[in-house]
Amino acid sequence: GGTVEIGEGEYLMRDSLHLRSNVTVRGVQGKTLLRKAPSAVSALAIDGDFGEEQITVVDPAGFAPGCGVAIWDRNAGGFHTTVARIIGQNGNTFAIDKPLMADCMVQNEAKAATVFPIVSGYDIEGARVENLVIEGNKQANVPLNGCRGACIFLYRAFGTVIIGCVARNYNGDGIGFQQSNDVVVEDCVSEDNAVLGFHPGSGSQQPTVRRCVARRNGSDGLFLCWRVRHGLFEDNLLESNGQYGISIGHKDSDNLFRRNTSRLNKQSGLFFRNETLGMAPHRNRFEDNTSENNGGAEIRIRGEVNDLTFVKNMIRDTREEPSVGILIEEHVGPVHLENNAIETKQQIEDERTADHN
């Protein structure tokens, strides 16, 4: 337990700030800045084998013990990408502190780069992060996928609390947590990241995201990945993102969304991904949300999803172009609509046949 306080200033990060169980890391609001160092990147000189704890690179410049490193090839994306710390060097061969998660083959364009989450927590519980500004320096870094990285990234980090942080300009996601139950994210801003603003995923149960802002991210503001269930998402602002304001899909059931505002996103303010019956995001409830001036239908419901509830939401488009409030596609099951205010050129476009209503 205990608290680590980080004073005012800018800190250049060559590896993650690694969270520990039941420890609070606290910065000074708006004045403690963690900046990602520019990345080095090299092709592998020889194959990295699954389970191996070293890599050999063509160009060792910029790689050194103590640096964070990611290793992948074109078949080893997602969770098959390895993120580790370099712990030793012999010429252009580097020892790492974790085994490789996949074969990374030279013939498949295997690479290593000094990219990593700037703040990370793995296999912990009860950690807390407060009042950090995290600068991803995306112009000087190669991408790291959201299954393994973000400005703040958690993996099996149960009960972690993130409060008052800014996550910006990362070449990937802003704040992401995977297989991490009972995570709370409050009063945070995720902006100008290359991909997602907030990314709860991979079976993260009972998340809470409250009073947060996601803006100008390259893809979605809030992306519920796979099996995000029994979550609470309230009083958030999702604006001017490059794809959807909110995206929900694979087995993301039984969540409550209330008093969120989704506006000026390139595509729909709320999007249900196209999932078959067993994998669809059933029984989600939306109360007192606002969706306005987004691209496409304000709310687009796809797939074989059942038992969605929309109560007292404001859905509007104040522009001159044709607009649709709610688009319900042909395979969607029951949708309950109650006391919603829909101010679009076409309020509801329902493509279902009688047997799907």
Spans of model-derived segments:
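N-terminal extracellular ligand-recognition/capping segment immediately after the signal peptide
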Residues: G2-T24, V28-A40, I71-A84, K98-N108, ...
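Right-handed parallel beta-helix/beta-solenoid
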Residues: H18-T24, S120-R128, P143-V161, C165-T309, ...
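Generic beta-strand structural signal
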Residues: L19, F50, G88-G91
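Short, basic/aromatic beta-hairpin or loop at an interaction surface
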Residues: S39-F50
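Parallel beta-helix/beta-solenoid
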Residues: D49-G77, S120-N141, Y155-R168
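Ser/Thr/Gly-rich low-complexity blocks that favor extended beta-strand/coil architectures
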Residues: T56-M101, A112
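A generic structural motif
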Residues: I87-N90, V133, R319
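Glycine- and charge-enriched low-complexity intrinsically disordered segments
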Residues: A102-E130
